[in-house]
Amino acid sequence: HVKQQTPDKPYIFSQLPDRSICAPAELQELFRSNSSTSISIHLSGGKLLRGVITEKIERSPGITSINIKLSDYPGALFNLSSYTQPGQSPVIKGRIIHPQAGDVLVLSLENDQYLLQKKAQKFFMTE
């Protein structure tokens, strides 16, 4: 009996930088947009993420989530959540995931900058 190795999934975000800084104002603008709005997000190196907001949900007061279908990566979904505490700036977290891809992009706040970083999906736990 031979244990089969799961084949590694292809990396579909290879043309994007490993780390990109995203403008907070641009990310916050996404949460002021409505469903079916076309959006674009500027990344380091002059790269752009383009897509359409497919869903916007207020999960509870101070927590809003949006889903964006990325037009340049069919099947990829950019899920973003904004967490707002009274008297503080909102904190945005997110991830871009594709079920057939081996790579994931994770958005997090580090040292007052929003970073979109590439990670291997097999090391990434979905929440």
Predicted features along the sequence, with ranges:
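N-terminal prosegments of processed precursors
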Residues: 1-127
